[in-house]
Structures are given as C-alpha cells and as structure tokens.
Amino acid sequence: MHRGDKPVNIEVAEPITVEVLDLDAQGIARLAPSEEEAAQDQSGKVIFIKGALPTELVTYTVTSDKSRFSKAKVREILKPAVFRAEPKCAAFGICGGCTMQHLDIRAQVAMKQRVLEDDLQHIAKVKSEEILCPMGGPTWEYRHRARLSAVNRSIKKGTVLIGFHEGKSGYVADMLACEILPKHVSDLLPEMRKLVMGLSIVDRMPQIEIAIGEPEDAQSDDPQKSKPVTALVFRNLKPLTTEDEQLLRAFADQHEVWIWLQPKGIETIAPFYPLTGKLCYRLPEFEIEMPFKPCDFTQVNHMMNRALVSRAIRLLEVQPTDRVLDLFCGIGNFTLPLARKAKQVLGIEGLESLTARAKSNAQHNGLSDKASFMQSDLFEVTSETVASWGGAERWLMDPPRKGAMDICKALAELHLQQSDLLPERIVYVSCNPKTLARDVEILCHQAGYRLSSAGIINMFPHTSHVESMVVFDRA
C-alpha cells in the first residue's frame, strides 16, 4: 500500500456531477471547497469515479482516500449522459482489456482527439496547423493479436481461467468470450480452458498468445482458403508429456488452428503442430503481402493498419526521386509500401529478428532492389548516427510507447550544425500522446520544424489507447 492511502468503503449519498473523463475512463468530479480551502483560494477535492461519464449526476462509493483526491466507483446514475452506451461484453468492468464500452464510439473518438490536442498544447506548447479527420473502422472483432493469461483455479473453482488481466491487478478475468476478438477465436476460449485443464502441466502454462493471419483468399469457395489462419503460442514452462502432445494435436485438428510452443525465452518459440503453415497480412493498395511469425510485432487491427499505412504515405508526399528513411520499421509495414513510391528506402529497426523478417519480406515482394534494412539501437542515437544514415528527403517514424527523444535531439543538433541532412518532411506515428508531445516540443522549438497536421486513428476501439499521426515540415 502506498503511503497516504486510506482503503475505505464509504457510500456517499450526496449527488455529484462528473466533469470530464481521464485516460483510464474514470469520471472526474470535484467537491465544493471547504471553508479552509475557500479561504486559501483552493479548489475542492478531486474524485475519480469508475463507471461514471461526463455530465452525469451520480452517487458513489469511495474505495481509496488520499489527501488531495479520492477514488470511487459509481453507485447510482441519477442522470445518465446522452452518449452512454450499453456494454456488449459480459466481462466489462472486470476485464482490463476494454475501459470504454459504456461510452458511445463517437464520444470515444472525440475524447481521444481531445487528449491529443491537450497534450500538444500543454506539453509541447504547439498547436497543429491542421487537425486531420479521425480515422475509424470496425469496433468489434477487430483484434488479431492478443496475449491471454492462464491460471489454475481447480482446487477452489474446479476450472482454469483464461483471459486478460482484471483492471490494474494481477488477477485473471473470468471470461468465456471476448467481443473484440474475432468470433472464431472468442468461441475457442471455453475450449482452451478444457484443453489446459486436461494437461499434466496445467500449473506451468501461464500464457497463451494469439496471432491471426488473413485468409489466403477471402472470396474463395474453398473453406481452407477463405478461413483466417490462427496460431496459438502456448508458454510451456515444463516439457509436455506424450499425452499432452496428443491433446494439443487433437485440439489443433478439431479447431483448425496452428499450435506453437515457447518453453523459455522468445527465441525458443517454434511451431509444434502442424509443422507447416503461413501467417500473413496484406496491403492491397500497394500490392504487398507480409508474412510474419506469431512472435513478430504487427498491428493488432488489420483493417485500420491498411488505413494507417495509406494515410501515412499520402501525407509523406513521396516523389519517385526521393530517398526515404523508415525508423522503427519492424517487419517493413511502411517500408515496403514506400518502396513502391520512392527511389530508395532504408528501414532501420532495433531488433535483429524483425530486421531479418523485413529483409525476407522485401525479397518476397520483389523489392530488395529498392528497400534495404539495417539493425541499430534507435534509443542510442547522436547527430553523428543520423549523419551516417545519409540524407533523405522524407522520414517516417513509428516508435514504441517511449517515443523517439534521442532521434529528435539529434535532429536539433544537426539543425545547428549540418541542416542539409534534415528531412524536409517527417510523418510520425505515435501510440503514446505524452511522449509524442515531448518529441513535438523538441522538433518544433529546437530543430526548426513546424507541426503541419495532427490527428488520431481509432486503432483500439473501447480502450483508452490513443494512436495518432502528425506531420512536420521544415519551417
């Protein structure tokens, strides 16, 4: 327990009006200031209320109390918001996978747009010249990657739990379906429970990773070609017995899935049964097919990834004579479509395994002559590092949550030393608005760029995850 925490369970009958929503989808309300606070010109105590939405009048139960704020859960909604929605999932409110199913999808998008704009204004001290129209797609059954936890509760409950963790806890949610997973995978959750329960290593199989590839031909009359390819990676901390192996093979045959095993680190992931198969996704606009392995990083939302790539390349305005850098390139998700447009593209990636996959994908798509790749730690970058990459008219950056601070600082140094190496335009794809805003501050106030446009992509509906895209031009 953190110092200052006061775990309580106090029902508050006095109604309060919720003002805004935070990124954890908690309603934020504020008590009227006490006489002492008012005398010191201070505002009242902040209450974070789980399950409450802006504009709603609610009563609540305080669950944790600190000197400056309290946490609570909604007790009764006296006046619901017009944008309140009925959650579709039975595990909503318990499972930590989704936090916003009770909020209309349009309101979800508006909230994420506000988060992006607020962070740009308050952290970066920059206002975008243009706000891009938010991008959205299917709101259910969109997630093609997932990591599920498994816990044996056979002693107390007579079952195994398989699912996402409960919100901000180490407990696994008791879920028999998941509305954001494709239906054929959601329907497998009860069957996976039975499978794991029957294994001799039920206590030593803590995780199942799901990776789904696109069908070979979705329009085909052949069911084998029109079905998505589904891989399940079982994290087995003990060797399987012969009986365990038989159960896994029977499960794979019955449910038409591809089973992989991971006995130790990520480097030990290998196919178990069947031994052959192919996971891939496609970018039809660019005539690109991207094979991948279950352990490779890919976007979880195939439909929105197509829209993401299309918008990024359109905004980059690549010319046939351009040299382009793609930083944090992964398996080539942006690099290979860019190679269809540019004279030459260099993809740089921190992980050796993804760099190797990117090279393989370039060869698979006949683009090895236009797309090259190198492995480099992009969190240890100096101006000399950037200079060694050579000049490029266009850059695309798609960093992980920690952002690209070292790269931005290196560009700021080059702005003062060797500005001819700076790209004319940068498209930055972000999965964390706060680190994005930090990097925007560096590029706009220290590296000589202006923020031309910014917008969100609703890559993860019903979650608080904010995916965004911004464009920088040399000032």
Swiss-Prot record:
GO MF annotation terms: 4 iron, 4 sulfur cluster binding; iron ion binding; RNA binding; rRNA (uridine-C5-)-methyltransferase activity
InterPro entries noted in UniProt: 23S_rRNA_MeTrfase_RlmD, MeTrfase_TrmA_CS, NA-bd_OB-fold, SAM-dependent_MTases_sf, U5_MeTrfase_fam
Keywords: 4Fe-4S, Iron, Iron-sulfur, Metal-binding, Methyltransferase, rRNA processing, S-adenosyl-L-methionine, Transferase
Binding, [4Fe-4S] cluster: 89, 95, 98, 178
Transmembrane segments: none
Function: Catalyzes the formation of 5-methyl-uridine at position 1939 (m5U1939) in 23S rRNA.
Catalytic activities: uridine(1939) in 23S rRNA + S-adenosyl-L-methionine = 5-methyluridine(1939) in 23S rRNA + S-adenosyl-L-homocysteine + H(+)
Entries under Pfam families matching the protein: tRNA_U5-meth_tr (PF05958)
Enzyme class: transferase
Family the UniProt entry places it in: Belongs to the class I-like SAM-binding methyltransferase superfamily. RNA M5U methyltransferase family. RlmD subfamily.
SUPFAM superfamilies referenced in this protein's UniProt entry, alphabetically: Nucleic acid-binding proteins, S-adenosyl-L-methionine-dependent methyltransferases
Record: residues binding S-adenosyl-L-methionine: 299, 328, 333, 349, 377, 398
Domain TRAM: 1-76
One annotated GO biological process: rRNA base methylation
Source organism: Polynucleobacter necessarius subsp. necessarius (strain STIR1)
Enzyme Commission no: 2.1.1.190
Designated name of the protein: 23S rRNA (uracil(1939)-C(5))-methyltransferase RlmD
Active site (catalytic residues): 431
Keyword RNA-binding listed: no
